[in-house]
From Swiss-Prot:
It is an enzyme of class 2 (transferase). It is found in: Cytoplasm. This is Ribosomal RNA large subunit methyltransferase H. It comes from the Bacteria. Its EC number is 2.1.1.177. It comes from Cupriavidus metallidurans (strain ATCC 43123 / DSM 2839 / NBRC 102507 / CH34). One of its GO terms (cellular component) is cytoplasm. Specifically methylates the pseudouridine at position 1915 (m3Psi1915) in 23S rRNA.
Amino acid sequence: MQLAIVAVGHKMPAWIETGFNEYTKRMPPELRIELREVKPETRSSSNNAATVMQREAARIEAVLGSLSKQCRIVALDERGKDWTTVQLAEQLTGWQREGGDVAFLIGGADGLDPALKARAHTLLRISSLTLPHGMVRVLLAEQLYRAWSVTQNHPYHRA
């Protein structure tokens, strides 16, 4: 099973790449995390937020098209469901049992296009705080690793 993180944005600071890579390398080979970066759209007087989100959505759709047809889509959104780490671990176990890959979508500065959110199987809120998009990558990778550690009774998670 592959966990794809499809994120708008590129050229992240080194500390974000280091943090993200730290958690992805800890994942077992049968549950690897792959980052797919999507170029952000530049906002201007002729590009309002809706236009920006639509153009970024087209790029995200192109990435989703390269993943398996049975890929489950989880869109990160401030209005999404709040899951505990244990609930995420339960979801991860269920996804593994069902088979297929999972794509986590991280939008750009304006968020995800409403059509993408409507297409998602799940809307997930990673935090009630406003976070830099690069940091969300690191937090998501860490939480996926932590969820996996819960399923394995690994001592990393000590709640």
